[in-house]
């Protein structure tokens, strides 16, 4: 016979173990298969979207800045910050080196990463910082089966597909239902030898944008921007690609605004593009990205030229066609200059006495501070986080 004195410690151990297990179950609840699947998708998307974590930043004013606007506010009346070539934030030398084996399959050569890199913060940080418009460039991967992100010949990630990254946006919008996101999708040319926006590419993009998930999260209105209330918790598609290799019914089935590439004048200082001919709805766009000053002009002059083009368009947005869409790109480069001006130099200056005023961003900060009470529309930045109050200044106009 065992004595009660022997059983007591055993009973205590069993009860303590059960209690610990119960506590662990409370602290770490079992995840559903759907949650595990989403976690896997977000992990694959992380080289472009960033690591999805619920941080304190998600509760900041910039993460929920649209809360302060009424539902009846028209999107064309709002000042909305965006990022140009959003997916390039992680394109470091290490990233380029890690992707060389894929780039070699594409049979292209790439320049140093600073020629392609236009951002240095992930999409999740951009969202929390108040960015709401994203410029995304896609093409087929080396296998010609999956849509991924490029900047010219520079593949941005081997694992982060277009569809994966969209799930990052969907998840973020679920956590921020007051916000509206606008995604500009553009087919990227020159990604690899013999690549083209063919029927297979177009069908792949169509399938992504008409999936069950996309139908839930994309605003289904076609051909016009509505109110903030209609767009909250959803994505508005800004379509900078054609489906001309597919029957017309495919284009008819896609929501959002269509900006035909043939009408988007390359390197345009002042583009006028009618995106809805029936209602005569027009977008006014500045996309003067490639400077054409004489070789050797230097960073200071080229920054000044780009600043002049940007502020001229923002002034037009504040004073003309107040019920129309204005879309201004503050981004630029002059990589054929000697020495070259990379996107970072154009945005922030080159850190020498030759650019004492900084780059376009620093100069725009002062300009935006002078535009209090004005509508300037969508403004697309490179390296948006410098100066640190640039985005907040746009939001506070």
Which ranges hold each PLM region?
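Fungal secretory targeting signals
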Residues: 1-22
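Long, acidic (Asp/Glu-rich), low-complexity accessory segments flanking structured domains
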Residues: 17-129, 142-175, 180, 245, ...
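Conserved, mostly hydrophobic/aromatic
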Residues: 126, 137, 183, 237, ...
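Loop/turn elements at helix/coil->beta-strand transitions in domains of secreted/extracellular proteins
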Residues: 129-132, 177-181, 214, 232-234, ...
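An acidic- and aromatic-residue-enriched active-site/binding cleft used to recognize and process polar
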Residues: 138-141, 185-188, 240-242, 384
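Catalytic cores of phosphodiester-bond-cleaving enzymes
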Residues: 161-215
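Structural alpha-beta junctions
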Residues: 203-222, 267, 317-323, 397
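C-terminal active-site rim and adjoining tail of enzyme catalytic domains
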Residues: 238-240, 244-397
């Amino acid at each position: 016979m065992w004595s009660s004195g022997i059983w007591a410690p055993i009973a205590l151990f069993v009860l303590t173990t059960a209690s610990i297990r119960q506590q662990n179950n409370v602290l770490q609840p079992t995840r559903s298969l759907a949650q595990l699947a989403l976690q896997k998708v977000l992990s694959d998307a992380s080289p472009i979207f960033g690591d999805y974590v619920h941080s304190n930043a998600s509760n900041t004013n910039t993460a929920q800045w649209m809360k302060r606007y009424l539902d009846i506010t028209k999107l064309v009346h709002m000042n909305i910050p965006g990022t140009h070539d959003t997916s390039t934030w992680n394109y470091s030398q290490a990233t380029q080196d890690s992707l060389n084996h894929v780039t070699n399959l594409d049979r292209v050569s790439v320049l140093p990463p600073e020629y392609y890199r236009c951002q240095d913060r992930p999409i999740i940080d951009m969202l929390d910082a108040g960015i709401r418009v994203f410029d995304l460039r896609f093409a087929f991967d080396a296998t010609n089966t999956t849509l991924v992100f490029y900047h010219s010949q520079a593949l941005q990630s081997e694992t982060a597909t277009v569809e994966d990254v969209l799930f990052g946006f969907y998840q973020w919008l679920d956590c921020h239902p007051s916000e509206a996101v606008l995604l500009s999708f553009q087919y990227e040319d020159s990604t690899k030898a013999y690549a083209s926006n063919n029927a297979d590419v177009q069908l792949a993009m169509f399938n992504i944008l008409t999936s069950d998930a996309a139908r839930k999260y994309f605003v289904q209105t076609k051909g016009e921007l509505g109110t903030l209330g209609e767009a909250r918790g959803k994505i508005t598609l800004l379509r900078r690609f054609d489906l001309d290799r597919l029957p017309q019914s495919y284009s008819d089935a896609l929501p959002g605004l269509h900006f035909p590439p043939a009408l988007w004048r390359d390197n345009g200082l002042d583009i006028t593009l009618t995106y809805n001919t029936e209602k005569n709805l027009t977008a006014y766009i500045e996309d003067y990205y490639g400077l054409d000053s004489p070789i050797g002009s230097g960073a200071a002059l080229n920054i000044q030229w780009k600043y002049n083009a940007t502020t001229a368009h923002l002034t037009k947005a504040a004073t003309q066609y107040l019920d129309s869409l204005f879309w201004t790109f503050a981004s630029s480069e002059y990589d054929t200059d000697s020495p070259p001006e990379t996107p970072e130099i154009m945005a922030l200056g080159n850190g020498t006495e030759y650019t004492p005023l900084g780059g376009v961003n620093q100069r725009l900060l002062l300009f935006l501070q002078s535009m209090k009470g004005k509508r300037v529309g969508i403004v697309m930045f490179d390296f948006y986080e410098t100066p640190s109050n640039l985005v907040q200044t746009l939001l506070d106009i």
